[in-house]
Amino acid sequence: MGRILIAHLFLPSSVGFSFDTVPHDEVGSKFMQKEESKDWIADTPLDESAIVSEEESDDDSLLSDLPEEIDSTNAQSNIATPSPGTVAAAISGIQPPPKTPSSDSPSLENSLSNLNDLFKSRGRHMAFSKNDGTNLSLPPSRHQSPPPSSVLASQRHHRRHDSELEEFARRASRSLSFSMNGTPQRRMTFDAEAWKNVIFKIKPSSFGNASFYNAISAATRSKQFDDHLFVGTCGIPTDSLPDSLKERISHDYITEHSSLVVYPTDTDFVGHYNHYCKNILWPTFHYQIPDNPKSKAYEDHSWANYVKVNKAFADTIVDNYEQDDMIWINDYHLLLVPEMVRERLPRAKIGFFLHIPFPSSEVFRCLATRQEILKGMLGANILGFQIPEFAYHFLQTCSRLVNIDIRKNGVVSFENRQIDVIALPISIDPGFIDRCLASPPVEHWAKVLQDRFRGKHIILSHDKLDPIRGLRSKLISFERFLQKYPEYRENTILLQVAPESLQDSEHLPHISDIVTRINSAYSNIASRHVPVILLRQKLGYAQFLALMMISDALIDNSLREGISLTSHQFIYVQRKRHRPLILSEFVGSASILNDNAIIVNPWDYSKTAEAFRTALTMSEEECQKRNKAMCNLILRHDAASWAVTFQSLIKESWKEQIDMQRIPAFTAQLIKEPYQNAQKRLILLYFEGTISTWGSQYHNVMTSLQRTINLLNMLTSDPKNTVYVFSALSCQELEQLFQRVPKLGIVAENGCFVRSPPKGDATMPVSKKEIAELWKNKVLGTDLTWMKTVSEIFEYYAERTTGAYVENKDATVILHLREAEDDEAAMWAAKECCESVNNFNVPCSATIQNDMVVCRSNKVSKRLAAEDIYSANGGDYDFIFAASNDPDDDTVFSWMKNFKQSKKEVVPFTFSVCVSEHGNSTNADAESSGVFGFLQALEKVYSA
């Protein structure tokens, strides 16, 4: 059994360095307690809820120092004992007193602490977390800012801030002298010798998607998940590191932490992450189209960096790939990796999961690199999204922008491959949360917070300071709530946890103004009541769980978001108190929880204000009913089952793809012997593009048609054979075409009308009256009023596509595109027609067949017609053969395969052929690249 290579931009653990010149043992003793000094380079699993925002958790950690996995038998030893700090002080409204410097707290360490704080707001180039008291630092970054300073003039005001960083850096490192300025003109200098024997430490990282990593950890503990390696960056600048040190780091990662380190250049990483991901992809995927000059500069200059980082990941994956390995690529940072790996490993198992929303096609098409991104994603065998809406948007976008075939079951046909598109929402790990809730730190904080907020209604919220999170609309709605309902002004608090993010500098002033306005109007000095508490730091998980326990409601007012695991955790934590959840309708979780949550439109301030009151006045019976229903919904699949399920789906999708690729070329030898030995045969052949090359219905290639008629006469002359031809043409057209094949069965308009073969001597003439009596109307009594509506839709697109025309038959409507002057316009019209009809509330479906768009009733299909033919003729066939070039006939091939599981005494021999250059069928037994080759092989079968 192979491994799983799990690619994510950040590894679950990061690296910090010590520049002290003391021996290893002394450093170990200094860094850790004595009993831990022997193995201080140790990794611990990230907890599932360390980062509340599962979709962009690298900026949204709840933990400044991540707790280790809790052992249910000894929870206390694994969670740090709480101590008073900035969080408690902020909640109480009193700032903690400054610490007095001592010999145990040298100025260097204080400087590093300040440096850490400054670095945290600058993305990837951060000092290592210093929460355990270790003296750790980072190598200097050598990145150059991709957009030139002349374009991004707004960055000039940061230069004084940069000089402060430089001063801190000089004080913090004895061996380094470097500049943190992002401009190309200022380069860093350092002493390379200082890095040769530097001691480093690997421990859990504050970057990355903690909910994802916890799901993998939970699945691993369940013993249902395969061995795996993480592939990602280590979260630090690496250009300054000598190769020998990188080798040491990589060795420890692979041997101790099951991780493969990717080393992009600092310039590429900053351009990729800080610029393209954060300023282009993240806003666009959340419906905030970047249109300012700064964003345009990022897009123009950082796309190349984005490509290079994706290529670095692909190179690492390919270089370490072994036979039978599976590759699982995650999130919008690595959208190009699937295609890059597919080009070099055509038969690899590749899955891709997008943890953030996928926008509608009208938004996605605004990206200049839309084609490259879509094709990059389509390199996978399976694409996973959080909810069906996101999967639908992706399918719709592919249909409109890449011109590929989309099937109703969420399968994309692209470059002779079938890609499955599925929705699989991530979930929480209830076992881990239970162990945390039972731990002393959570109990302690719950008691502290209950005492602090006794007699108050607490409405909790946790968001980054990002415009997408809807903080502004939330605060305005809360202000209106207080204005309209004065009885809540003295006893209700909106407690907003807002950890820092890359967008702080731009968004914070707007939020601060609103908070100040509300608190100025409704605070009470005498009672020390403040209606809005804005916490600008990351909370420990114990603290946040305690906050959720004592809160009277939680609101997620995001303008766009995937699955809100914060909301799911709140629901689970509130199983005893049953307090309600206020949820934006634009959050993916809303489609899962439905009306059990209080669903709001974040743009409607008045309705959101009413939602606050509804949450605070809801009866206990109603709260309990809603909470129970929501718990049942979120616990259908936990975090472990999510990871295990997606792993299984990657394998299944890959197997289907391999089975399709293994389809042999159709030759007479494949069915010659079974054909000769059979006593009763059923032969089903599609007309257009299978037994006849097909132009328009008036321009058939006559030589091919004559050859087809000759072959059909040979087959129908054998009394052991029952032969049917399927077609999209009408009854009259098919009778005219095949009047020289009197013993032929015909299925017209793709299953709407069926004519059985006449009985008796094949040489006897058959009258028109007798032929007419043989036709069976399969749509008799079926509602066909939709035809007028569909015809109008088809006419709309035909008028805009030169050479296209619409044909209304007895039970189908066809848009003919074969003679369209512009092939690209014709393909666009076909896709749009199918989408317009299939998304319209009419009892019919439209499919693309041989340069036609055919719309028929949902009550009929070629598979149903095939089943009726089989039953009507006794059903005791010992040989069933079918051939088609229509992807829609894959259902017929699937029906034939079911005979192999039949419990009948005599199981018929079945064989299906896909006649197509692109191998459109996954259920066919063989394929033929064209009509002439297929006819030649079938002629050999008969004449053998």
Swiss-Prot record:
Keywords: Glycosyltransferase, Phosphoprotein, Transferase. Its EC number is 2.4.1.15. Disulfide bonds: none annotated. This is Putative alpha,alpha-trehalose-phosphate synthase [UDP-forming] 106 kDa subunit. The modification Phosphothreonine is found at T189. Residues 73-113, 129-166 are annotated as: Disordered. Residues 73-84 have a biased composition (Polar residues). GO terms for molecular function: alpha,alpha-trehalose-phosphate synthase (UDP-forming) activity. Residues 173-652 are annotated as: Glycosyltransferase. Signal peptide: none annotated. InterPro entries: Glyco_trans_20 (IPR001830), HAD-like_sf (IPR036412), HAD_sf (IPR023214), Trehalose_PPase (IPR003337). It holds the Pfam family Trehalose_PPase. In the N-terminal section; belongs to the glycosyltransferase 20 family. The keyword Transferase applies. It comes from Schizosaccharomyces pombe (strain 972 / ATCC 24843) (Fission yeast). GO terms for biological process: trehalose biosynthetic process. It catalyses: D-glucose 6-phosphate + UDP-alpha-D-glucose = alpha,alpha-trehalose 6-phosphate + UDP + H(+). Residues 101-113 have a biased composition (Low complexity). The modification Phosphoserine is found at S141, S145, S149, S150, S163, S177. GO terms for cellular component: alpha,alpha-trehalose-phosphate synthase complex (UDP-forming); cytosol. It comes from the Eukaryota. The keyword Acyltransferase does not apply.
